[in-house]
Amino acid sequence: MMAEAGKEQEIVLKGHMGTHFDVMDKEFPLSYCVLPAVLFDVTSVPADREITAEDIDTSLLRKGCFAGFCSGFSERVPYGSRAYHKEHPQLSYDLIDLLLDCGVSLIAVDFAGLRRGKEHTPADQRCADRGAFVIENLYGMSRVPKDVTALTAYTFPIRLIGSSGLPCRVVLGSD
């Protein structure tokens, strides 16, 4: 138990707590601080299957946009719990590739990552290699009114020297 707690503390000290993104081997471009945004309500996707392109309106995706996925998971499952890290929703690899093919700059989820377990880091690296960052644990997307269609995402990372994760603040505003 102590070894597991030590591992969790090490992860937190490297910037992987709360809303953050994994730096991978890239640098966050300042041009990503303000982006047009689209939110996808995926609360109706059953927990026993991946979120796929069929679950969203892909025509809303634009090159250089912020794509947020609101599953409601972070509001139902306690942050930091075993279930939060092991049972969260996942985006299918086909959907991840579609987002990257569309040129999405930021992919935000209200859960612990695009993929679970051993697939988490490779999925983040896949995005980073294509110029996209993944914002994890973005709480509160469900508060954005469903009828708001023109959104801007303001994303402000907090630089931590030597960290592999950057805590960030994200504000979604309507145009």
What are these regions (language model features)?
Residues M1-D175:
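Active-/binding-site microenvironments in catalytic and ligand-binding cores
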